[in-house]
Swiss-Prot record:
Record protein name field: Fluoride-specific ion channel FluC
Lineage: Bacteria, Pseudomonadati, Bacteroidota, Flavobacteriia, Flavobacteriales
Residue ranges of the TM segments: 4-24, 35-55, 63-83, 96-116
Record text on activity regulation: Na(+) is not transported, but it plays an essential structural role and its presence is essential for fluoride channel function.
InterPro entries recorded: FluC (IPR003691)
Length: 124
């Protein structure tokens, strides 16, 4: 039960952070490309790399911190469902190039961000 509490707490915080990130990005960037979800997901990948890399080095850290940060916070912050829905909308509106770029950049940069986070965390 304690594990579920920490996941829920992190997930709630991550969801609020995603909402705030979306508000800020949409305030300054208005275009067909879904920048808010894109930036959120790439930032979430960097965070999960940082958290996982850091926690991997720490033996005395509570396992609940891992549930809070990785499963909860990062899980609540990033959003694969919005990514999928936005790509379907782009394809349905015949914006195939933008959908292709969004998918390709999200996967490539997401992997690079996670890897970068792991490297940074291991150097700390």
């Amino acid at each position: 039960m304690k594990t579920i509490f920490y996941i829920a707490l992190g997930g709630g915080l991550g969801s609020v952070l995603r909402y705030l990130t979306t508000l800020v990005i949409n305030k300054y960037v208005q275009t067909t490309f879904p920048y808010a979800t894109f930036v959120t997901n790439i930032a979430g990948c960097l965070l999960i790399g940082l958290f996982f890399g850091y926690l991997e080095k720490q033996n005395a850290v509570s396992p609940y911190l891992k549930f809070f940060l990785i499963t909860g916070l990062c899980g609540g912050y990033t959003t694969f469902s919005a990514f999928s829905n936005e790509n379907i909308q782009l394809l349905q509106s015949n914006q195939i190039l933008i959908a292709f770029l969004y998918i390709s950049l999200s996967v490539f940069l997401g992997l690079m961000a996670t890897w970068t986070g792991l490297i940074i965390a291991k150097e700390l």
